[in-house]
Amino acid sequence: MRLTAKQVIWLKVCLHLAGLLPFLWLVWAINHGGLGADPVKDIQHFTGRTALKFLLAALLITPLARYAKQPLLIRTRRLLGLWCFACATLHLTSYALLELGVNNLPLLGKELITRPYLTLGIISWVILLALAFTSTQSMQRKLGKHWQQLHNFVYLVAILAPIHYLWSVKIISPQPLIYAGLAVLLLALRYKKLLSLFNRLRKQAHNKLSL
């Protein structure tokens, strides 16, 4: 039985409510001592992990819709992507304001360049910013065929973000490895598309070098 448009709307409502839960928990934890000995790091890691969860959920939608034969499920992908961007923005903001501090914000650019894991993080965030800004139907119509080309960069984020997480922790624990493994699995489900994209980029690069 396929989902109806009305059921998808209710599913979106449920997903938005689910998206609010991590923020509500974080507010509660901050106000009731629910964080650890280093609350700043806890906030950074929590927002970063939540962004990764939404990213992985968004990547899961397409194969899930295909295998479950639920085409309308695709309509939930955008809101998951926007929640991912919101969490990633909080993640970046918590680093800039809570760890560096307002007085040290001029150092942010230097930090992003000199620390490789931060470089991967900011590249991922910039891509997510572009995807969020162009996620509307009006932007899709305006960009035409270039819209899909731009949104294919989500696969690059799926590679860079788990590496950013792995690189940022001092001691490798199972958690970042699990996220990395899930990202690899979801990318493997799209291997045909990724292989096609790779071959197209290689062909374009070859043509440019031949000029």
From Swiss-Prot:
Transmembrane segments: 8-28, 54-74, 82-102, 116-136, 153-173, 178-198
Annotated GO CC locations: plasma membrane
Transmembrane keyword on record: yes
Keyword Nuclease: no
Coiled-coil positions: none
UniProt cofactor note: Binds 1 FMN per subunit. Binds 1 heme b (iron(II)-protoporphyrin IX) group per subunit.
Any GO BP annotation: protein repair
Domain of life of the native organism: Bacteria
GO molecular function terms listed in the Swiss-Prot or TrEMBL record: electron transfer activity; FMN binding; heme binding; metal ion binding; oxidoreductase activity, acting on diphenols and related substances as donors
Cofactor requirements of the protein: FMN; heme b
Membrane topology: Multi-pass membrane protein
Subcellular location per the Swiss-Prot or TrEMBL entry: Cell inner membrane
Pfam family, one: Ferric_reduct
Role noted for this protein: Part of the MsrPQ system that repairs oxidized periplasmic proteins containing methionine sulfoxide residues (Met-O), using respiratory chain electrons. Thus protects these proteins from oxidative-stress damage caused by reactive species of oxygen and chlorine generated by the host defense mechanisms. MsrPQ is essential for the maintenance of envelope integrity under bleach stress, rescuing a wide series of structurally unrelated periplasmic proteins from methionine oxidation, including the primary periplasmic chaperone SurA and the lipoprotein Pal.
Quaternary structure annotation from Swiss-Prot or TrEMBL: Heterodimer of a catalytic subunit (MsrP) and a heme-binding subunit (MsrQ).
Family: Belongs to the MsrQ family.
Name of the protein described by the UniProt record: Protein-methionine-sulfoxide reductase heme-binding subunit MsrQ
Gene field: msrQ
